[in-house]
Amino acid sequence: MTFLQSTTRRRFLATSLLVSTVIFGATAPNSFAAVSKAEGAIAVNFFWEASSNSEMTWITRDVLITESGDTSYFSIIGNWTPPFYIGVQEIRNAETGEVRKNAIFSAWDTHDDGSCTNCGPESRPTNGRTVMTQVGPGVTPSQFGYEGTGANAFINDFGWKVGDRVRAVVNLRQVTDGTEISAALQLNEQPWRFFGTYKYAKKFANLEPGYSFIEDFGGKPMIVRSAEYGNTWMESEDLTKRAPISSVQARANTGANTKYHLIKQRNKTSLWAQIGGDQFISEQRYVPAVIEVPLNSYIPIEARLTTLNLEGGAAQSYKTQWLSNKSKVDPSSPATTTPKKISIVCVKGKTVKKITAVAPKCPSGYKRK
């Protein structure tokens, strides 16, 4: 079962975006040959553009999942440099029938063979290896191969469902001997959840608007999967620069089931797509959209604190600086405010603890409920 998009495909997507002709794809009800069972549902990729990404070290985007089923992957944010993606999946255990709706965060190695398609995770060289330096509560770290090599991690109890909105935030920062990226997720209006931190051996200066996609990773072409993406922008660390990501193009991949998809802008703030089944027939075209992005919104301080895994005095110090920076770019914003505390529930066997703090996290040995 394939969980990860290949580096080869990611590079193809980058190249095809540059040479694409932007035209709308025609759609119609199904009236042609049956869906091929030899391949899965075709993937649809979203390519995002901003006026500039210079000095942008923070990015946010959300996905509203409208239909899903077994072996579905909704990638929310992906970048080529640095190479990573983050999103949510649905997986059904064929033996037990258990359905797991998890979250996944993957980062590729940056050595010369980082894109190797026949290298297993055990063959990852030490030189250029991406490592996970921090692991969030309830997060299971791992590694991958055969689609490039790298490190990945899963939140197996994330528990999203159709109709939920999942928001992702990713931060990049340079360190002495490489680059770190950290991520957090929010399910609807629940508290933000720290995913983890990866460290690349290579240095990267900033994040990209990047890509998103909807994918069938298990060869189940009749299962319908759909979602809409939007509410996305980038920020610099000190808030002096902000770039709305207001331009996007979406396109289906090439395969036996390419025509069975639909891409449509159903409102001004997002772009929606559907794959799987035989409800719609569409030509393989780039479908562009202009997305309305809130002009005066910033990534919430709670999201930043969680993404950086800060708490206590470190969290308060960071928040004080953030409020000072925000007051300089937004005069209506007060420079100080009372920290907002949130509560989480942590369990260890039969022991249950409620933790309340500005950026709460479970004690060692406890798992977040």
Please tell me what each predicted stretch does.
Residues 160-194:
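Carbohydrate-binding surfaces in secreted/extracellular proteins
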Residues 143-167:
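Short, aromatic/His-centered strand-loop micro-motif at the edge of beta-sheets
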Residues 258-332, 345:
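Hydrophilic extracytoplasmic domains
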Residues 32-35, 326-369:
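Polybasic, low-complexity, intrinsically disordered segments
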Residues 63-67, 172-174, 187, 216:
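Short beta-strand segments enriched in hydrophobic/aromatic residues
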Residues 35-139, 155, 296-324:
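Secretory/extracellular carbohydrate-interaction modules
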Residues 2-33:
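Secretory targeting and sorting signals
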Residues 180-291:
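Aromatic sugar-binding interfaces of carbohydrate-active proteins
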